[in-house]
Amino acid sequence: MRTINISLQEIFNEIPSEKREETRLSFAISNRLDALMKEKGLNKKQFADALGKRPNEITRWLSGEHNFTLATIAMLSTFFEKPIISVE
């Protein structure tokens, strides 16, 4: 039986840098939404109801794996009256 001798760092280094950045941004947006929901005292159901969405869609948004469109980010920024992301 062969032994696989590869470290997590080696695996991480094989992931293209743009994919790592995409993942970082996705989780940053999810974390921002979670923080803004807590700030407003909203749970997933209340947030979904306020936006006319289903709770499972909010769960997907908070998973860190959702590919947000600019339209959705703009809608969320308007809802919270705060930026979701900033562009420098």
Please describe what each predicted stretch is.
Residues 33, 44, 73:
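Generic structural marker for isolated residues within well-ordered, non-membrane alpha-helices
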Residues 41-59:
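Short alpha-helical DNA-recognition segment
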Residues 37, 48, 77:
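The alpha-helix within a helix-turn-helix
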Residues 1-35, 39-40:
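N-terminal flexible/basic segments that precede or flank functional cores
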Residues 22, 44, 86-88:
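Recognition helices and adjacent regulatory flanks at domain boundaries
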Residues 71-86:
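DNA major-groove recognition helix of helix-turn-helix/homeodomain DNA-binding modules
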